[in-house]
């Protein structure tokens, strides 16, 4: 029978990885993480874009360009279960410069997803060893712009389209409010959000803050400028529930790295 170590994200931490009779599609942790066919499971439902699914601390390409940020990420990952359980949040933001006026492509999203991936692996291992059971997917990645687009879609199109969008939005909103670790990417990239969407986002962030759930936010804006697009309430709450970590340097997306 074919072994699953070539696709299983647990392989690097599993003592029976690659061993016939043990490392197979019938492995319970494998099924939990990757699904029966190895294509879904918890790993496939994190909503992480395909290009980032293999990101982790070992291949995080910011060590030279952002050593302080790398040290923060490393410290978080090295104690990731406890950090998430204690609700330790992060705000990863860019410092623009002459060569990168908008602070894009500095590794914020890659770093945030690396933490999310590392946590998912650690969480599955914990549950597989008899620790806290996993009832719902413990990790969710969502772009702020996609959430706003989904929110707005509830008011456009036919009745059936609006009804479908409404159901999808509230399903996602519930996940955002309750998932163990949330990565919300690129907040503050649009012009000033509407009061109604600000209220929705505030409700989500408040719920997470009150439950002490860990949240990682990425932005091209420092926290003091976030209020210009997201409002004072959201900026204040994010500031109070996260450690702020600066990223600098050139736009590495031009070279296909990030």
Please state what every model-predicted region is.
Residues 87-91, 138-139, 181, 216:
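Residue-level preference for the first positions of well-ordered beta-strands
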Residues 85-86, 135, 176-179, 210-212:
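Short loop/turn elements that form and flank the Walker-type P-loop nucleotide-binding site
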Residues 59-64, 97-103, 150-153, 189-192:
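Surface-exposed cleft-lining segments at the edges of enzyme active sites
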Residues 1-79, 244-245, 249, 255-258:
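A short, basic N-terminal segment
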